[in-house]
């Protein structure tokens, strides 16, 4: 099923960009349903502190369609960064004052703004179609809102600032669901979490956790060997 829409978004500070499922390709329908039904505790055991503490941030979970079908936009953070250095992640970052209300339009604007700043994509070609519950990253104290997007009109992307971003790339969903690329990432602390072997790197941590849950609840997950473990470098 494919919907039809002429909706386009031109970002304006503190104005809520439209969030709509109109015009989505049929294969994204299961992901859109996840956004409307999933509970925070189904995505992660790390939830925002009840005290309200934590730095409000947002990431753009951007789905596109490439030569090998559905794909996700990802980036590798620069190895010199103070937090999450060298990790593969979604585009995103902390909310700025001009993004607006952290409990309303703020995460939507921040996700698009940060994606443009980090990858050079044109936000006008992105259709937002859902928002996942806010989650928490204890090591960096970020309260993160994953914003779901459809790359309706793809634009060139690159690592805009090499001091922050090492590279920008897309990964086919088929590679993420391939059991051969699935693993359990073992942190030196003893923490175990989902991992993906993609683009000659290990995708783990918060980003891997969100992808793992999306694949599961969208019904895209394939059986894989959960006993296969990859130890993380002690610096991770």
Model-derived segments and spans:
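NUDIX/MutT-family hydrolases
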Residues: 160-197
């Amino acid at each position: 099923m494919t919907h039809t829409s002429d909706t386009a978004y031109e970002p304006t500070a503190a104005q809520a960009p439209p969030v709509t499922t109109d015009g989505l390709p049929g294969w994204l329908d299961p992901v859109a349903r996840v956004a409307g039904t999933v509970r925070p505790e189904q995505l992660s055991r790390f939830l925002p502190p009840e005290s309200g503490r934590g730095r409000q941030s947002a990431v753009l979970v951007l789905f596109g369609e490439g030569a090998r079908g559905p794909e996700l936009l990802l980036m590798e953070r620069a190895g010199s960064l103070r937090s999450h250095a060298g990790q593969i992640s979604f585009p995103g970052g902390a909310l700025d004052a001009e993004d607006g209300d952290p409990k309303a339009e703020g995460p939507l604007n921040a996700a698009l703004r940060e994606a443009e700043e980090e990858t050079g994509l044109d936000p006008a070609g992105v259709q937002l179609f859902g928002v996942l519950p806010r989650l928490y990253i204890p090591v960096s104290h970020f309260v993160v809102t994953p914003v779901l997007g459809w790359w309706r009109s793809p634009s060139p992307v690159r690592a805009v600032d090499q001091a922050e971003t090492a590279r920008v790339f897309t990964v086919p969903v088929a590679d993420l669901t391939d059991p051969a690329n699935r693993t359990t990432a073992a942190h030196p602390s003893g923490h175990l979490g989902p991992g993906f072997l993609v683009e000659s790197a290990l995708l783990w941590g918060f980003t891997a956790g969100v992808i793992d849950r999306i694949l599961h609840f969208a019904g895209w997950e394939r059986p894989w060997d959960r006993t296969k473990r990859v130890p993380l470098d002690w610096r991770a």
